[in-house]
């Protein structure tokens, strides 16, 4: 039975996304994003959205602003 809901990826998909986020690249280029999406069985839009949210979460945990700004701000 699938636990997949309209609200987001399954546990297995999140595992793939987390692995890529932590071990491969926090800022995947379009080609890498496409490969990660294919591996996780998600659309590129869903994958990109997940990475964006995950990056904001990571930046907050590191004590950084959730959005990228220049160092001079």
UniProtKB/Swiss-Prot annotation:
PROSITE patterns: HOMEOBOX_2 (PS50071). GO terms for cellular component: cytoplasm; nucleus. Residues 3-62 bind DNA. Keywords: Cytoplasm, Developmental protein, Homeobox, Nucleus, Repressor, Transcription, Transcription regulation. CDD domains: homeodomain. It is found in: Nucleus; Cytoplasm. SMART domains: HOX (SM00389). It comes from the Eukaryota. Atypical homeodomain protein which does not bind DNA and is required to modulate cardiac growth and development. Acts via its interaction with SRF, thereby modulating the expression of SRF-dependent cardiac-specific genes and cardiac development. Prevents SRF-dependent transcription either by inhibiting SRF binding to DNA or by recruiting histone deacetylase (HDAC) proteins that prevent transcription by SRF. Overexpression causes cardiac hypertrophy. Acts as a co-chaperone for HSPA1A and HSPA1B chaperone proteins and assists in chaperone-mediated protein refolding. Interacts with serum response factor (SRF). Component of a large complex containing histone deacetylases such as HDAC2. Interacts with the acetylated forms of HSPA1A and HSPA1B. Interacts with HSPA8. This is Homeodomain-only protein. It comes from Bos taurus.
